[in-house]
């Protein structure tokens, strides 16, 4: 494909790499003529009898996993899904998630990887924006029954089919019978096709779908597995949501499977549950966000569980403080790997042979020798080592644009294809990065990205709200929490009523503001805009005074 960075491919409405870059990455051996389904089949051929996946109820060999994926692919094709279709995949961590992903990969059907925490507000938005043919869900997701939501999606025309892992009645369709089809051997997906859509936290309420193509995402996975030392002896625990880029492909679930290792599936990340799994399954690798890492450290200091098998803890999603980083090896008994990554592409790792200073005080260096990183000032000029600027990047696994968002792409990507991340970083002379903050109006709550505008728009739609603005407030556990400042109409609603309203709107629970303040007015900038900077500073001073 030869489209320019800001021009959608004629095939799939997503910007692709220019021809010169395609040739560069092919010649370098980064990209291969293979899709994810073919990669799993190759791994199964090497390790047919090894256990690929296990949970509390089931253990699947590679041969069994491949057969189940191919049967489901055949069943989904019979149900009406075909190459180029889009579905919204909304499943909890589980073997069914892996089987469904690879069945869709085989068909060339593109899943939008929704998170378990997403609810009707987000799911409906994804379905409509992506023109999804189907919603694929479960009978239970973290205590939530999504089936009434699925019926509403059908009734409103947001999608045409709703397929459920578990019990389902018409108009919903149960997925279990689809596994009875004869296994599908052929593979419709091409290496250059979109494999899936990851989700961007973004800074607005518009869904931003990140098109990840088979060949570049496979490179992301394989190169990550090499850097992180994943092999057939790896036992990887999934505490974080498997739909996340971090858990899925950095190297994560798929990296483990392509290396011939074993994935231990957990729907929970709390220390009590995960420590028991680590001891029972002899887990060697796992990944956490900083708030969970802190909980694990505190729990292990008081509990002293058997974590002797654990070799590597990856921590990413937000910056891990150096004091917490220093505790990982003595408390958990394993090596720490700091990770700076984004679903749009670029991922940085501290290396397994890095000296302690690098591991404790940086978020690593880029994965690929062909990652081109610039740290720039407000005028787009590169800054020197140790200076803070915006992180911009292009490379063999960083997208060239979001799906169906040409106007946004013109702002988010430079004319020569560099992605403007909005992250403020500094870089040392050896290319290691340190995260210093964000430029974009986005809140990072324990690794989950929240677009302030999305929450603001819902609040402003409330009949008793005149105006609303949402900002981050510092938090020692999550890094950031959310605070909404609301100018009410009379009679003024209570903070509790506004939170209940947001839940009723179908907003994911992690996006509902932790704190809501009713105020008569907002501070303004010199040109009459809301000064979020002043509001953040007010919160910071208030929290410091309480400490």
UniProtKB/Swiss-Prot annotation:
InterPro entries per record: AMP-bd_C, AMP-bd_C_sf, AMP-binding_CS, AMP-dep_synth/lig_dom, ATP-dep_AMP-bd_enzyme
Record GO terms (molecular function): acid-thiol ligase activity
Entries under PROSITE patterns matching the protein: AMP_BINDING
Biological process per Gene Ontology, one example term: antibiotic biosynthetic process
Keywords annotated in UniProt: Antibiotic biosynthesis, Ligase
Superkingdom of origin organism: Bacteria
Family: Belongs to the ATP-dependent AMP-binding enzyme family.
Protein name (Swiss-Prot/TrEMBL): Pyochelin synthase PchD
Natural source organism: Pseudomonas aeruginosa (strain UCBPP-PA14)
């Amino acid at each position: 494909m030869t489209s320019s960075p800001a021009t959608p491919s004629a095939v799939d409405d997503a910007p692709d790499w220019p021809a010169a870059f395609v040739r560069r990455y092919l010649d370098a051996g980064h990209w291969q003529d293979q899709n994810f389904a073919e990669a799993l089949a190759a791994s199964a051929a090497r390790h047919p009898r090894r256990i690929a996946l296990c949970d509390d109820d089931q253990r699947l060999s590679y041969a069994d996993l491949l057969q189940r994926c191919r049967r489901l692919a055949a069943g989904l094709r019979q149900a009406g899904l075909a190459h180029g279709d889009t579905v919204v995949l909304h499943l909890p961590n589980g073997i069914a998630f892996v089987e469904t992903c690879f069945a869709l990969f085989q068909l060339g059907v593109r899943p939008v990887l929704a998170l378990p925490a997403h609810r009707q507000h987000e799911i409906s938005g994804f379905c409509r924006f992506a023109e999804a043919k189907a919603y694929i869900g479960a009978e239970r997701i973290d205590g939530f029954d999504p089936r009434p939501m699925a019926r509403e999606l059908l009734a409103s025309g947001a999608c045409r089919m709703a397929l459920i892992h578990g019990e389902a009645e018409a108009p919903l369709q149960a997925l279990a019978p689809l596994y009875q089809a004869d296994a599908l051997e052929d593979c419709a997906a091409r290496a250059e096709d979109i494999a899936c859509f990851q989700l961007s936290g973004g800074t607005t309420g518009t869904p931003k779908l990140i098109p990840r193509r088979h060949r570049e995402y496979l490179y992301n996975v394989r190169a990550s597995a090499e850097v992180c030392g994943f092999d057939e002896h790896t036992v990887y625990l999934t505490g974080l949501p498997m739909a996340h880029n971090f858990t899925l492909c950095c190297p994560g679930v798929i990296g483990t499977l392509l290396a011939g290792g074993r994935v231990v599936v957990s729907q929970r990340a709390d220390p009590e549950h995960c420590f028991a799994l680590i001891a029972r399954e002899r887990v060697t690798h796992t990944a956490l966000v900083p708030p969970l890492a802190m909980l694990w450290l505190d729990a292990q200091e008081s509990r002293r569980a058997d974590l002797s098998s654990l070799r590597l803890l990856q921590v990413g999603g937000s910056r891990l403080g150096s004091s917490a980083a220093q505790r990982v090896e003595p408390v958990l008994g394993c090596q720490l790997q700091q990770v700076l990554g984004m679903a749009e592409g670029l991922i940085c790792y501290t290396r397994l042979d890095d000296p302690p200073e690098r591991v404790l005080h940086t978020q690593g260096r880029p994965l690929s020798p062909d990652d081109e990183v610039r740290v720039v000032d407000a005028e787009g000029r590169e800054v020197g080592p140790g200076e803070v600027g915006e992180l911009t990047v292009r490379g063999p696994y960083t997208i060239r644009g979001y799906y169906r968002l040409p106007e946004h792409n013109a702002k988010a990507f430079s004319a020569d294809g560099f992605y403007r991340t909005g992250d403020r970083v500094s870089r040392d002379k050896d290319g290691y990065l340190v995260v210093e903050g964000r430029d974009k109006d986005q809140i990072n709550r324990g690794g989950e990205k929240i677009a302030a505008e999305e929450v603001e728009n819902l609040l402003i739609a409330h009949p008793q709200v005149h105006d609303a603005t949402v900002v981050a407030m510092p938090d020692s556990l999550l890094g950031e929490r959310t605070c909404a400042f609301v100018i009410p109409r009379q009679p003024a609603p209570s903070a509790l009523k506004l939170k209940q309203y947001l839940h009723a709107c179908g907003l994911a629970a992690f996006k509902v503001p932790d704190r809501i303040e009713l105020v008569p007015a907002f501070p303004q900038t010199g040109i009459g805009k809301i000064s979020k900077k002043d509001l953040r500073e007010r919160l910071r001073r208030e929290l410091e005074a309480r400490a």
